Amino acid sequence: MPVLRVALDLPLHRLFDYVAAEASTADIGCRVRVPFGRGERVGVIVDVAASSEWPLDQLKAAGEI
């Protein structure tokens, strides 16, 4: 499964990783709805990677791209 690196409008200077069923490098720059905390946020896809520094079973699934 591809891993999306997502930038969120937060006072944290880091990217957040989410798994996606279908994603490609063409999705870079697109907005995506992702779970964050108790709600959802809209972020921007910065990168599509094959792996993450976190175990894949700990990553949440991204929503609609």
Predicted regions and their residues:
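Accessory, non-ATPase domains that flank or precede helicase/AAA+ motor cores in DNA-metabolism machines
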Residues: 1-65
